[in-house]
Amino acid sequence: RTNELMLYKNMEYGEILKDITFLIDNYESEFYNKEDLRGLLFDCINELLELSVSHGFEGNLWHTYLTFLLASDENAYSTSCEIVGEIEGSLNEIALHDFAIFKEMFDYDFEELEKSLDADCLKIIMDYKSGNSGGKVFNRRVRDRICDLSRALAATQNVDHFKRTLTQFYKEFGVGKLGLHKAFRVEHPDNSDVEIIPITNIAHVHLDDLVGYEDAKKKLVDNTKAFVEGKKANNCLMFGD
């Protein structure tokens, strides 16, 4: 039913979803060659593994993939819910329609599909263990945020609960590259508009990691405390090479 999506359409990395949906709809059809369908299934698993390893995902990779799509897609509903959370109006009904489809995808049992195509490859990705704390694209903080949301969405009891859970995520973190990342760089491509590019894999640096700047760190901490307490404080910009 993914062709019935109204908001979450034309998503980046959405081809895997289209192919899996095609398999779900047609694995019992006599119109298609079983070996071709089986080959498509293994192609999907390959793409899912490549995406998951590069982003550091673990657990149920089908769920984390669907969650990644939902957390990344900037559409009329997801961008409207940033910061404010629940909204009013017809967008809610449209979003509920789309989330019903995603909930079906979350809850789908692949057992019969595996048996029909004589492939047990899906079992591997339902409880995948990552060997790294993060991936090449996402650091651990972003990876954990996606995996936590994935488990929360999988545990929802109905579509309304699914919608509330995802909407709360949009409220707390935002959506897309500006929501998932906290550092960016500005690029000026030739003959093109200025682009804001997320720095996708950054290390977490704490004040204790900075050696030899005790006086500067004390001034920064004191200034921050003054700001929090409502006293006079300076704007600060930290930079380094």
Can you say where each PLM-predicted feature lies in the sequence?
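Phosphate-binding P-loop
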Residues: I199-T200, A226-A233
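Walker A/P-loop nucleotide-binding motif
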Residues: Y213, G230-D241
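Short, hydrophobic/aromatic alpha-helical segments in well-folded domains
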Residues: H206, N223-T224, L237
